[in-house]
Amino acid sequence: MIILALNCGSSSVKYQLFDWERKEVVAKGMVERVIIGDSFIMHEVPGRETYRKEYECPDHQVAIDLIIRTVVDADHGVLKDINEISAVGHRVVHGGEMFTRSVLIDEKVLDAVKEVQHLAPLHNPPNIAGIEAAQAVLPHVPHVAIFDTAFHQTMPEHAYLYPLPYEWYEKYGVRRYGFHGTSHLYVSKRAAVLLGKTPSECNIITMHIGNGVSHCAIKGGVSVDTSMGLTPLEGAVMGTRCGDIDPAIPAFMMQKENLSAKEIDSILNKKSGVLGVTGRFTDRRDVIEHASNGDHRCKVALDIEAYRLKKYIGTYMAVLGRLDAVVFTAGVGEMGWPIREKTIEGLEGIGIKLDRERNKGAMTRKRESLITTDDSPIKVFVIPTDEELVFTEDVVAILNGTYTDHMNFDYSFARTDFVRK
């Protein structure tokens, strides 16, 4: 059984082909610069050189057509025929309150996703375009939606409601939803295995740190709070997003700079965060390098980011009452040891003892690592995320009729005998 996982962004389409019987990725890649011009595909097959091809993709339909042609290509593909694909799993960023689990996509589901796209105007439209494009190319196979927000639908009312007019929630759905759900799900279940416990026995703080950043407080295996809110703008400092700020700042700056609502929204989402402070970088590797060479703004950007990460650990520790582990994941979380060090140092008083050598050695996306001392009461792990594996397992379980929900389903990666490939 071959499962195709798709993640459609506004100008990119990521994909992965997973062979369920062999339990391994047989191909993965990305089409970049969709719509905006100079498009190209980067196609990776284990054991082969990466294949790159320039091909104009004015829309997601052409991009997905290109992906299908590439995976069945005689020279660069891994499939003999398109009919080898058994099902498609689609990442959908926002499912609103309606979707608490992954679901088979039918007309009713697609209409419901369209109804909540006003809650994620930057993300849901390309997700929808990807679903419709893939259905056109693969009309006879099941398509499954996996929602970023679903994992967080267990949050209690006092955690997801904002202290705003209640009518805004009733009329417009204004509340905290949270994102990166599949990533938080995966690494929290892996952390439970590393702790030698079941997820229901664990209290864990997971920190997904990439260009986008989110934290999750997980109590007994379920999300009870998360840092992103109605949109992915709230929370920690991010690559280009501001995260938590005084809500009066946008109105203040709109008056000072004569900005429209659209312009201020763009600045907060695309020109703030690490980029805003440094003035030129979003890649933390560049920020770390220039900070070490004396660039004050880069140093301040790192200090701000680590300080905010540290604050969320303290906040969520108070929420959980008892903490077993903290997990770093995603690109920066997995590879950025200086940021991890800045975040964790000084937390000995609350039971977190960093092992600096272990932390520096945890610089790979292929290994799970403990970065605290053996006698640290609270453990800190670096766990490479695998959202596509969550997609795949949800799809297969839905096809087999064995899927329940993310809390109770028996994921392979939640077992002690799981081996990451």
UniProtKB/Swiss-Prot annotation:
This protein's UniProt keywords: ATP-binding, Cytoplasm, Kinase, Magnesium, Metal-binding, Nucleotide-binding, Transferase
Enzyme Commission (EC) number: 2.7.2.1
Stored Gene3D superfamilies: 3.30.420.40
Class of the enzyme per the UniProt entry, highest EC level: transferase
UniProt-listed PROSITE patterns: ACETATE_KINASE_1
Residues that hold substrate according to the record: 91
Pathway assigned to this chain's UniProt record: Metabolic intermediate biosynthesis; acetyl-CoA biosynthesis; acetyl-CoA from acetate: step 1/2
Keyword Electron transport belongs to the record: no
MF GO annotations: acetate kinase activity; ATP binding; magnesium ion binding
Residues flagged as site, Transition state stabilizer: 180, 241
Record's protein name: Acetate kinase
